Amino acid sequence: MSLCIGNFDKSILPNSIVEAVTVPQKMYGVKFDGVNSAGVRTYDAARFVWEPSTATKAGKDSFLGIPMFTPRECITEYDTVEGKQKVVAYKGDNGYDTLKASKTGDVMMEFTRFYYYRPSETEWILSPEYIFGFKPAPAFYRDGKLLDKVYVGKYNLGIGYVSQSGVETLSNVDMNTIRTNLRSKGMYMWDLKWWETLKMLCLVKYANCDVQACNSAGYNSGDRTYPSGNADNVRGLDGSNTSIATNEACLTFGIENAYGNVWKFMDGVFCNDYYLYFKEVSEITNDPTSVADLSVYDKMANNIAVGGNNAELKTLTFNTDYDYITAPQTFGDGPYNDYYWGQSGLRECLVGGDAWLGGSGGLFVFAVHRAVGIADVNYGSGVMWY
């Protein structure tokens, strides 16, 4: 071993190594106190500002232009030769508006990989690059592979199993049927990996864990299956047509009605007696029909909140093996203003709430009280592919 004394000549190193050790790595964080809904942005996000947009005014958005915070709207179609979805056009391309208006393909939001570190229940730090101790955001690590992009439906899954503007939301269909129809076109239902990834982005950008109070109340009363496209005129990635408090369609990172409207089935996760069981969505063809079927699933070591049916959630799970999961840990008065439903037995997982939930919907509302195989007019799905 040789000893280097004095100034080190960096010219002998490859440019990639020099850049890695000399360019500060970006980190965008947020920290909450566990009592108040509003948090404090940290690191490179400390001086950032954000306000939701409306149909007449673009909001303030310091995050705009940073790839991980700026998903791209695009249209994708199923390639029958290669057996997978492909991007055919991005918003802004010539002919894009014509394709969208003619309901060609599916309208998706293209999200870019990032990494996260969650030091505690109430703190998140995100980075576009790998930093020691950080992990890939869960949506971007699947089947043992690191993904550059994930494509998420801009709209709730509509009748005809599409993500398109001006289509009635699909509901009253069970998970097996939805899963089968989406697989035939190279797509998946939303899963908890994606939902938790979206939460991370929202928490840092909004610096608030009550999205109905800071972004939009969304559809929180009335018809649960409004047609899609009612937020198409919002002049930004987040917000709603008129105001935060109005009962109307909303955008969250370009996704319409990510919460409210209809409950969203979560694939890849099931609950039994308050324990969560996980499996890659690519490996699931049918719902488990008995507890014995869960033997091939991974199990989170600690249980989520026991009981508490129709109760406000107070604290979130913080499990070192599944530190991206933010399921209810305890219930009572808390900063999230979201509700939790839980019952023992084999249950499906639903998130987001529906148009009947009022001010109790949002990113953290969580339900594991309905039996596997349920179909309900209040239940629908999101769509994604990778």
Q: Which residues fall in each region the model found?
A:
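Carbohydrate-recognition beta-sandwich/jelly-roll modules
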Residues: 50-55, 107-144, 301-304, 314-348
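Acidic glycine-/aspartate-rich tracts in secreted/extracellular proteins
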Residues: 114-116, 156-158, 194, 269-270, ...
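A solvent-exposed, charged loop/short amphipathic helix patch at secondary-structure junctions
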Residues: 157-176, 276-300
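Short, low-complexity N-terminal tether/leader segments at secretion or assembly junctions of large
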Residues: 1-20
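C-terminal, surface-exposed recognition/capping segments
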Residues: 26, 30-32, 196, 217-235, ...
